[in-house]
Amino acid sequence: MVNNRQTLDLKLFPASPGELVDWQLSDTPVPYPEAVAAMEARAAAIASGEASELVWLLEHPPLYTSGTSGRETDLLQARFPLFSTGRGGQVTYHGPGQRVAYVMLDLKRRRPDVRAFVAGLEEWIIRTLDTFDIKGERREDRVGVWVARPDKGPGHEDKIAAIGVRLRRWVSFHGISLNVDPDLSHFDAIVPCGITDARYGVTSLADLGLRVRLSDVDAALRRAFGEVFGPSELRLPETTA
């Protein structure tokens, strides 16, 4: 069932006039603890008015993260390090070929509504996928963005993007992960997002037959972000936020 969040009024998350969101790209994989420390520091600075909002694009080395709803049984095989984290959600995989976007926005100033914010993140991904002629969809009982897979059988769907966020003083951090061309076999070692129904799997742009560069995905993400959340300002590649 398609979630009624698809009717989201995208004007619910406007930026203040004249304010730009920093848009930062790291060109080498960032260790997870380093990323979390940088996000927490930036979120605190945003909350205190000492820094601007930020979208941080990066990749991680292969690893698993477990959110606040994660269960020990969701890790089937410890192929890579597992990090417990304060984001919402359960267990997922991060690694090369996956575009992670950490989103640090001041929702108190924009609109303090977590559910609508998550719907906004989904809309951002869906519009990004539209660039590549992929139909991403929301689902009522499954956060993230899904792609119908009738080629696998009736009712089959695969997740192409995961969402997990945390708020502190109404500033968001953590964010989204979009599968561009990761090694999907690494998801076999976990129960992704706690979903055990065999009809629901994981996919990527490459798995769907699209070989695209991360730079092309980044450009699409930035365009779609501007439509949903407002304009951004590109910063030179760095390894920390």
Curated annotation (Swiss-Prot):
Signal peptide: none annotated. InterPro entries: aa-tRNA-synth_II/BPL/LPL (IPR045864), BPL_LPL_catalytic (IPR004143), Octanoyltransferase (IPR000544), Octanoyltransferase_CS (IPR020605). GO terms for molecular function: lipoyl(octanoyl) transferase activity. Pathway: Protein modification; protein lipoylation via endogenous pathway; protein N(6)-(lipoyl)lysine from octanoyl-[acyl-carrier-protein]: step 1/2. The record marks K159 as: Lowers pKa of active site Cys. Substrate binds at R87, G88, G89, Q90, V91, T92, Y93, H94, A162, I163, G164, G175, I176, S177. Residues 49-233 form the BPL/LPL catalytic domain. It is found in: Cytoplasm. It catalyses: octanoyl-[ACP] + L-lysyl-[protein] = N(6)-octanoyl-L-lysyl-[protein] + holo-[ACP] + H(+). GO terms for cellular component: cytoplasm. Keywords: Acyltransferase, Cytoplasm, Transferase. One of its GO terms (biological process) is protein modification process. Its EC number is 2.3.1.181. The active site is at C193 (acyl-thioester intermediate). Catalyzes the transfer of endogenously produced octanoic acid from octanoyl-acyl-carrier-protein onto the lipoyl domains of lipoate-dependent enzymes. Lipoyl-ACP can also act as a substrate although octanoyl-ACP is likely to be the physiological substrate. Belongs to the LipB family. In the reaction, the free carboxyl group of octanoic acid is attached via an amide linkage to the epsilon-amino group of a specific lysine residue of lipoyl domains of lipoate-dependent enzymes. NCBIfam families: lipB, PRK14341.1, PRK14345.1. This is Octanoyltransferase. It comes from Nitrobacter hamburgensis (strain DSM 10229 / NCIMB 13809 / X14).
